[in-house]
């Protein structure tokens, strides 16, 4: 029987400062070979050019003025994620990638009439542990609209590179339940670029509306690593608090990485491939952070109100395979919850429902 290697030390310091390596052209080429599917939607939307026709994709419907002075670009359909990941890999190859912007792009991307495939929803529910119902989990709408955000994050001049970016937090607000049969209009933009001790952070906002009414909002916070002279001090792990008593344990197998990639369209090879993980310095693949959030939310599903906000901070990655411990405690009308390593109590995420 293969050893699980649960004692591999993947600390937050290592995640942000360590194994997320700078990609050389050789590493980028190796990762591009892992992405085997041919590109089918590899057209650019340029958020930095003053020319409205610059970088206009073939699936672009029209454009106008969005709020906060952003240029709003309407797409005819959701972009294909695979081509966007390949673009991100090519973007780190010297002489191929463009110059990074000094600020978030003044661009808002939108797509209307996104329908839910009931079989895909059922597949997602099974992978993440939700009940099979016609109501969309809060995290499913993130998956549904994420290709639009991915297009934004791979646009020329986006201030942080997608390759090697660290997803540090995600907040989802559900205004009302969304059911199968409803079509959703999405729009996305980036804001709040700010310095961080390890680089720069920004927020990518994704909003879902039905009939002109906002029903769902997701805010993902990403960290783009940048080299700092001398580096920062290592965190003192002795200050880590003891984990709370757990209410459930889950075995997270490598199949979770491949299954979630299939249902989410997020085929980042650090989640599905030993080679892809090693190219970024991880000894083996790690679980998608949004799978971890979805699995925790599924455990709370019977207790969720009609409208709520679920906020999560991602801590240490979940190596595949491993065993994790879930804990939850009521706080007023909501919940606090967490996911830790069942072996040594290292935190994987902390969250709240309010």
Region locations from a protein language model:
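N-terminal intrinsically disordered, low-complexity tails
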Residues: 7-46, 51, 55
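HotDog/MaoC-like acyl-thioester-processing domains
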Residues: 62-95, 99-100, 148-150, 168-252, ...
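Hot-dog-fold acyl-thioester-processing enzymes
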Residues: 66-167, 229-303
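Hydrophobic residues on conserved beta-strands that form the core of alpha/beta folds
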Residues: 111, 217, 307-309
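Short, structured beta-strand/loop micro-motifs enriched in basic residues and often containing a Trp
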Residues: 165-171, 306-310
